[in-house]
Structures are given as C-alpha cells and as structure tokens.
Amino acid sequence: METIKLLNNEVFNKKDILSKMMDDEFYYGYLGVNALSSSASKKLLDSPYAYYRSLTEKQTNVQALRDGQLIHLMVLEPQKVDYLTFTEGTKASKQYKLAVQEVGSHNVFTNAEYNKAKKISERVRSVTDVKNILDGARFEIPAIDTYNDLAFRGKADILKDGVVIDLKTTADIKGFERSANYFSYDLQAALYLELFGAFDFEFVVVDKSTLDVGIFKCSDNFIDSGKRKLDIATERYYDYLQTENIEDYVTRGTL
C-alpha cells in the first residue's frame, strides 16, 4: 500500500487521498495548509514569512481568480457551468448577495462575468490545435507526491499522452515569455513533471484583450530553472520550520 505523509505528519493511503482531492474543499482547504504546491513554493521563493502570510491572510486579486475559474470551467469542463448560478447586475446587488448566501460565492457569478468568460473560452475552443489537445484528454487531474521529503500537491488542467497542459490567461500574449519567468511558471512545470511522471509540459495561453491564442512548449533550460527554484523553495520551507517565531523572520545578506 503506497502512502503519503503530509506536512502535519498525517499519513494517507495514496489511492484514498487522490480520491479526496477531487473535492475542492479538501484540495484547497485541508491540503492548502498540509501540502505544498506550486503557488506555495512561489511564496517561499519570496520568503518563509511571505509563505506564512499566505496561510493566514485572505487572498487578494479575487476577481482575477474568479475570472480564471470560470474560463477554466468553460474550456475544460463546460458541463459543470450548468450547476453555477448567474445573476443580473453587479456583485453589490441584492440578487447576487442572496444567491451567495444560498450556494456560496464560488458558485455565483454575474452575467457580466459570464459573458466575458464565454467570449474568451469560445475563442480558445474554436482553435483547431486546441481542439486536438482537448480531444481524448483528461481534465483537472490531481496528483500528490513527495519532493525533497515534503508533500506536494498539484492538479493538471489537461493530461494527455504523458503531457501536462496548463491553461493560462494573459493581458499581453507578446510578453508571455517574460510573464512566465516573472510568475515562476517554470517552477510549476518542473513540479508537475515530477508529480505526474510526465515527459513534457505545455501552456495554452489566451490574451484576454485581443483573444490571441498561443501554445508554448517548455525547453530543458526552462525546466532546469524551475527545478532550481523548487529546490530553493524547499530549503526555505525548512527555514520556516526552524524559525521559532515567524513574526521575527528577517532576510539577511551582505551587499
């Protein structure tokens, strides 16, 4: 029986936890604290204190996350859109607030949000190369494993023939290469190759303004850069564990 030990030292049967990871509340809630991820690693690259804050403070830029959630559903799992609630007006409207009380904010979107996401997702799904990627693929597949003796989780947007494909939106597709480095997408690619035992990683990218669509493969140099960042992130996590009072953590160096 293959098992996985989480950051809180709880041990799960690998098969059982993968089944639980299909539930978003378990995946983002419980495992958000008790397993590392690409997003957690990016915080650790900033500092152990930045990682600590990410565990204890509410997320910012919530609208971008909402837009991304809806676009992902419409492109990858359009059948699930039928289970969402859409309302007239803004998120300040009485109708929206009542709907949130009934089914939760993650299940309620305004018609304006719907129309924006629909326009983008229809463009993505209309591209022949993207259609070929989606045909016969599996979507939103979870994985969990250890890296440098630490539990890591991940969820592949698209998994097909040993290739992990991630759907990204961007404000400027011409600058995606720069964005990929800035947002450490190389770290995500390196981690997911490890988690899924995949041999390649690609990005399907859509420009939210121009609706241009791009498909970007990852070079060996890109993956190697991600591995270096991943190793730094795990070192920072061990620093986090060894810091008696994280509020006193300081970054030290000599100029």
Segments and roles (model prediction):
Residues 142-144, 163, 168-170, 206-208:
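Histidine- and/or cysteine-centered catalytic micro-motif in compact active-site loops
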Residues 2, 181, 191-255:
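Metal-dependent nuclease catalytic regions and adjoining charged, substrate-binding loops involved
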Residues 129-133, 161-163, 194-200:
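Secondary-structure boundary elements
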Residues 70, 187-194:
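Short amphipathic alpha-helical face segments that pack within enzyme cores
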Residues 154-176, 192:
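Conserved catalytic cores of phosphodiester-cleaving nucleases, focusing on short active-site segments
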Residues 1-153, 250-255:
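Metal-dependent nuclease catalytic cores that hydrolyze phosphodiester bonds in DNA/RNA
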Residues 58-60, 105-109, 174-183, 219-221:
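Short histidine-centered catalytic/ligand-binding loop motif
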Residues 150, 183-187:
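Short, glycine/acidic-rich beta->alpha junctions
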